[in-house]
Each structure stands twice: as C-alpha cells, then as structure tokens.
UniProtKB/Swiss-Prot annotation:
PANTHER family: ATP-DEPENDENT CLP PROTEASE ATP-BINDING SUBUNIT CLPX-LIKE, MITOCHONDRIAL (PTHR48102:SF7), ATP-DEPENDENT CLP PROTEASE ATP-BINDING SUBUNIT CLPX-LIKE, MITOCHONDRIAL-RELATED (PTHR48102)
UniProt-listed CDD domains: RecA-like_ClpX (cd19497)
Record keywords, A-Z: ATP-binding, Chaperone, Metal-binding, Nucleotide-binding, Zinc
Family in the record: Belongs to the ClpX chaperone family.
Binding site residues for Zn(2+): C13, C16, C35, C38
Organism: Levilactobacillus brevis (strain ATCC 367 / BCRC 12310 / CIP 105137 / JCM 1170 / LMG 11437 / NCIMB 947 / NCTC 947) (Lactobacillus brevis)
Positions of disulphide bridges: none
Signal sequence coordinates: none
Protein name per UniProt: ATP-dependent Clp protease ATP-binding subunit ClpX
Subunit annotation: Component of the ClpX-ClpP complex. Forms a hexameric ring that, in the presence of ATP, binds to fourteen ClpP subunits assembled into a disk-like structure with a central cavity, resembling the structure of eukaryotic proteasomes.
Chain sites annotated for binding ATP: P120, T121, G122, S123, G124, K125, T126, Y127
ClpX-type ZB domain location: 1-54
UniProt xrefs under SMART domains: AAA (SM00382), ClpB_D2-small (SM01086), zf-C4_ClpX (SM00994)
Length: 418
C-alpha cells in the first residue's frame, strides 16, 4: 500500500470522498483511490455474502426420529433397518454441513460412512434408499452393479454412476456432490471362487477395485454424454467425498455362511444357548451378518472397509404385504381407488382378495416389488370396460377375481340409489 503524493491538490477516496487527513491510509491505483475504511467495508460485504452462500448450502437435516416417522408413511415394517439408516443418514449430512462451514477445527476429522443393505428380493432396499433421498431433498440415482466392468472392457465405467446422479441434479455439480447413490445387485460382483481359469474377473473383483476410490472420496472425471472415456473428450469433475453410497443385494446363500459361523456343526454339546436361539429362528440369520461373512461371500476386504454400516432387511410375510397394499401414503390400493374415482366409480378390495394377492407375491418370490404387476393383472379388464359404462357405481374385488380371474362384483347406480 502507498499514498499518492504526486497529484496536485488533496487526494480523496474515489468511493467515499474523504481526504487523506480524514482516514488512516489511501491506496492508489491507475486513476483511482480507495481508503482503508472503504476497504474494510468491502471486506465485510464479501464476508457476509460468503456466509449467506454457505448457509444456503447447508442442508436442513431432520432428526433420526423424524426420518423414521416419515419413512413409516411410505415403508412398512423393517423397523431395525429404518432406525439404522436414519442414524447413518443423519450423521452423514451433519458431517457434510460441518465441512461446508470450513471452520478451523483442530478436532477429529469426521469420515464418511457408506451403507450396505442386505435383504431378499422385494424387501424394500431400493425403496428405502429412494425415500431417504426424497425426505432430505437431495439428488438420487440408482445403478445396477451387474452392468459395470472395470475400465477397458465392454460395459459401463463406474464413473457413469456419477453421470446419472449429475443428470438427476440437472447438471448442478454442487447439488450432485451431496446426493445419494444406490448401487443394486452388489452381491453379483462378488469375486468368483478360486479356479484354474486364466480369464480376468472384470465384472467381479475388478469392479470392486474400480469402485473403491469413488466410495471413499475422490475427484472423478465424468464424461457428460456417458459412454467410454477417450482422450479428446471433455469431462465434468465431481468430488465424491460427500456423496452417500448405499449398496444393496440379496446375497443368496449368505445365511449358510452365518449358520456355519454360529456353530451349525456343534448342535448339543458345545453350542451355547444364543447360537441355538439364532439357528432356530430362520430369517433372523440375516440380522447376524457381519463383515467377515461378506468377505467369505466374495467381497474384497478393501471394499467391505468402505461400507462400515451394515443392516439387513427381513423377508416380508403375508401380513406385511397386505399392509403394503393398503397402509402407505401412496399404497397401490389407494392409487387404484383414485384412478376409478376419476371415472366416478368406487373401488373396494375384500380383505380376502388382498390376502390372495399377498400369497401370489410370496409364491412368485417377488416380494413387494411384484404386487404392482399382480394388482395390474387383476384390474386390467375392469379398467378396460368401466370407461364405456355409465351405470356402475362401485366395483368389489373378490378373492375369486384374484385367483380365478372371475368377474368382480358390480354395484349399479340404480341399485345403490335404492
């Protein structure tokens, strides 16, 4: 900083008009002067604007109890999993907000905790992750691990997962960097059993290795148009440090691994009461999966290490599926009731009909995921005929409508009036 002494007359600040005598210092530039008071004022304005921006970037995170309360409106059952996920998500976004403040804190650095969700097909893994993103109002993307291969082989690069998130954030990189990515079928990239084959495992262990960096946190180069990367292509850089990764899979056969670990071969002498209790309770084996079981299943240690939070979903029973059909905020039965109401027709499902649909889903081993196709099959002919009729006031779905494709019971308008 320097004072101008070469100009004729008193030097004044170009911004406030004060002279040298009225301020401590005046800084000169090409044809312009600024005093120390205006410099301080400019700094205050910039700091205030920066703090406002930081505040805007801070996510409003509901408490774990509030997250579970909202999840209960959409997801039936899975109480333990919902509690685990709500705490994990709450802590993750507390960490994100703390990092956004950029405070000079000498305390411990909070590390990211990604989540692994184990559960049978149709138990709600994807829907839970999707619901969490909706509650937090952050971008969300779903990826299928079976489509991924390591770089240089036919298939998708792992960076394409980030592209989906970026697209769902409308190419807003800052929003994408705070999103949630759910990678499904993660059990399908377990490394193959040791054998004499010299073929490289490009869709198993190779993909696990390729995912390590983005799970942990790295600056990834994402091709904006997708596809394979090539040297002439421009990239969008995404920092994955604050992206929450949730991976899920059915892990068929892992119950056997848990059972062996808990002492399946020591029935009677040597088996403690806790082991016997677990072994006698079927589905509860899933609740006792530990990282060592995932290692034996075929996930590599480095990959497991980046998924410190592990939770399991129980297989849905008949009662759960009936509740899923009727209770959630956007339950399928409520959706079809609304569809028919738009044609001024009431829709009623007899309780026994709902149970038959639940039994069908269990028989097909599709869980909650298969309920939509079942109810769509039941309703298809009804929804085809009804718009052409003006005499129907109410449709009643019976068990026979579900099991035998029998005609539903119709209540006509003149019958209802009488």
């Amino acid at each position: 900083m320097f004072e101008n002494t070469e100009t004729e007359g008193p030097v004044t600040c170009s911004f406030c008009g004060k002279t040298q005598d009225q301020v401590q210092k005046i800084v000169a530039g090409p044809g312009v002067y600024i005093c120390n008071e205006c410099i301080d004022l400019c700094k205050e304005i910039i700091d205030e604007e920066f703090n406002q921006t930081a505040a805007q970037e801070t996510l409003e995170v509901p408490t774990p109890a509030d997250i579970v309360k909202t999840l209960n409106q959409y997801v039936i059952g899975q109480t333990e999993a919902k509690r685990t996920l709500s705490v994990a998500v709450y802590n993750h976004y507390k960490r994100v907000n703390e990092m956004a403040q950029e405070t000079d804190d000498d305390g411990p650095e909070l590390q990211k905790s990604n989540i692994a969700v184990i559960g049978p097909t149709g138990s709600g893994k994807t829907y839970l992750a999707q619901s969490l993103a909706k509650i937090l109002n952050v971008p969300f993307a779903i990826a299928d691990a079976t489509t991924l291969t390591e770089a240089g082989y036919v298939g998708e690069d792992v960076e394409n997962i980030l592209l989906k998130l970026l697209q769902n954030a409308d190419y807003d990189v800052d929003r994408a960097e705070k999103g949630i990515i759910y990678i499904d079928e993660i059990d399908k990239i377990a490394k193959k059993a040791e054998n004499v084959s010299i073929t490289r495992d490009v869709s198993g262990e190779g993909v696990q290795q390729a995912l390590l960096k983005i799970l942990e946190g790295t600056i990834a180069n994402v091709p904006p148009q997708g596809g394979r990367k090539h040297p002439q292509q421009e990239f969008i850089q995404i920092d994955t440090t604050n992206i929450l990764f949730i991976v899920g899979g059915a892990f068929d056969g892992i119950e056997g691994i848990v059972k062996r670990r808990l002492g399946d071969q020591t029935i009677g002498f040597g088996a403690d009461s806790q082991e016997q209790h677990v072994l006698s309770s079927g589905d509860s084996l899933m609740q006792h999966v530990i990282p060592e079981d995932l290692l034996e299943f075929g996930l590599i240690p480095e990959f497991i290490g980046r998924l410190p939070i592990l939770t399991a979903l129980e297989k849905l029973d008949e009662n759960d599926l009936v509740r899923i059909l009727t209770e959630p905020k956007n339950a399928l039965v409520k959706q079809y009731e609304k569809l028919l109401a738009l044609d001024n027709v009431d829709l009623q499902f007899q309780p026994a009909a709902l149970r038959e649909m639940a039994k069908l889903a269990i028989a097909r081993n599709t869980g909650a995921r298969g309920l939509r196709s079942i109810i769509e099959d039941v309703m298809r002919d009804i929804m085809f005929d009804l718009p052409s009729r003006t005499d129907v006031a109410k449709v009643v779905i019976t068990p026979e409508t579900v099991t035998e494709h029998a005609e539903p019971e119709l209540v006509l308008k003149d019958q209802k009036a009488s």
